C-alpha cells in the first residue's frame, strides 16, 4: 500500500542489475569498498521458497558480486573490498543440527552461538556469512550489535 517495490533476491535479472550497478559505481568512483547493510530478504513478505533456497539465492548474488569485484581488482590493479553488516547473531544453538566437516576440516553445516535473538542465517535474511568468509567471497564483516553486555539473549 505504500507504493514501495521489493526486488526479488532470487531473480537473476535483479542480481545482475545490482552487480552491474555496483560495478558501474566502481568504474566511476575511486571507492574502497562496496558495503551492504540490511539487505536481501525482508520480513513480512510471503514466499514459497524454503530457507535453503533463499540462502542459495543470496549466496549466488554475493558470489557474483565478489567475482566481479575480484576480476576488476586483478584487471585494474585495485583493492576494492566487499563487506557486509549482518545482524549480530549468525545462528542460535536452539536447533537440532550437529556440526559436520569436509575432508579439509572446514565446517560445512552451520553451528550457532549460545544466544537467543534475531539470527541472520535463519529468520528472514537467510545469509550464510560464515560460508562467505570461508570461501573469501567477502573481505570483512561488521556485525550489527546494537545492545549492551547485559542483554540476556546475547551478552557480548
Region annotations inferred by a language model:
Residues 1-24, 28, 105, 120-124:
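Active-site-adjacent "subsite" loops/lids of carbohydrate-active enzymes
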Residues 1-8, 40-56, 60:
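Aromatic- and acidic-residue-enriched carbohydrate-binding clefts of CAZyme catalytic domains
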Residues 5, 112-113:
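General secondary-structure edge motif
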Residues 17-50, 139-144:
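Active-site groove signature of glycoside hydrolases
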Residues 48-106, 110, 116-156:
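Glycoside hydrolase catalytic-domain groove-lining segments
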Amino acid at each position: 500500500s505504500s507504493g514501495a517495490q521489493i526486488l526479488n533476491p532470487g531473480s537473476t535479472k535483479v542480481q545482475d542489475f545490482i552487480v552491474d550497478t555496483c560495478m558501474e559505481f566502481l568504474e566511476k568512483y575511486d571507492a574502497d569498498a562496496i558495503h551492504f547493510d540490511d539487505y536481501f530478504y525482508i520480513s513480512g513478505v510471503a514466499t514459497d521458497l524454503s530457507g535453503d533456497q533463499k540462502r542459495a539465492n543470496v549466496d549466488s548474488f554475493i558470489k557474483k558480486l565478489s567475482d566481479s569485484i575480484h576480476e576488476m581488482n586483478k584487471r585494474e590493479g585495485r583493492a576494492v573490498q566487499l563487506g557486509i553488516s549482518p545482524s549480530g547473531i549468525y545462528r542460535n544453538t536452539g536447533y537440532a543440527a550437529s556440526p559436520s566437516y569436509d575432508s579439509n576440516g572446514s565446517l560445512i553445516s552451520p553451528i550457532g552461538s549460545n544466544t537467543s535473538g534475531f539470527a541472520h542465517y535463519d529468520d528472514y535474511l537467510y545469509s550464510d556469512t560464515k560460508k562467505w568468509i570461508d570461501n573469501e567471497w567477502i573481505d570483512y564483516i561488521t556485525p550489527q550489535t546494537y545492545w549492551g553486555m547485559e542483554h540476556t539473549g546475547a551478552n557480548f
